[in-house]
Amino acid sequence: VRDGAMMLDINMDDAMLDAKEEMTHFLNLMASDPEVARLPWMVDSSRFEVIEAALKCIQGKAVVNSLSLKEGEEVFLQRAARVRELGAALIVMAFDEEGQATSYERKIEVCGRAYRLLTEKLHFPPQDIIFDPNILTIATGMKEHDAYALDFIRATQWIHENLPHAKVSGGVSNLSFALRGNNYLREAMHAVFLYHAIKAGMDMAIVNPSTAVIYADIPKELLEVLEDVILCRRADATERLIAIAESYREQPLQAV
């Protein structure tokens, strides 16, 4: 909160915890702190009973993270109706019965289908629908992963042009998993990605606000290489990034 978060994402999924009980207890503690309670909350769980219990604890408008078409239309609509009944907005993952949408074509197919189901069958308020078209890991050395960031950005633009009032979000840390151990480079990659995704219409992102890097502060050489990787501009972009990565390993992170 003190580092500038505008919404709090709360997750209690852990094999060692009773997630439903812990979520309820933790939300009640949060509600007792005025500094924390003033922010909107996002309830994050893979178990719908945990989400449902959490929404019953929240007084203001919450966001559910997340539902998908993974288990089919009937389960999706049933749960979305309950979310609406409890007054929350909804993040919808680009995931259906066939699996996670990784390409641009699959992302817009799944998001378009989910939007139509929600708005036509449930009359779910479109301004309360937030799509997560899957931010996936790039710079892995595998050619099939090269366009993942660009496909997310393109899907974001398509959603804003074709699904009226819907929003777009995503978990940005997924993008840079291939750079684990090089925190500055990871955060610089996130900054470049967000710069382009926001221009395409991205509305919100799950990030660590205490370690963010400012786009304008990224060295020109690194910025060019990161944009080549994210926008898929060169076949050798990943190799060029790896070649300069070590020189940024000790670069300090500063809170913004």
Predicted regions and their residues:
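Glycine-rich, proline-tolerant flexible connector loops at the mouths of alpha/beta enzymes
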Residues: 2-39, 98, 135-143
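Catalytic beta/alpha-barrel core
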Residues: 9-16, 38-47, 62-72, 126
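Active-site-adjacent beta->alpha loops and helix N-cap segments on the catalytic face
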Residues: 16-27, 45-53, 70-82, 99-108, ...
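Conserved, mostly hydrophobic/aromatic
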Residues: 54, 131, 197
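Active-site loops and adjacent core secondary-structure elements that bind or stabilize anionic groups
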Residues: 157, 163, 174-256
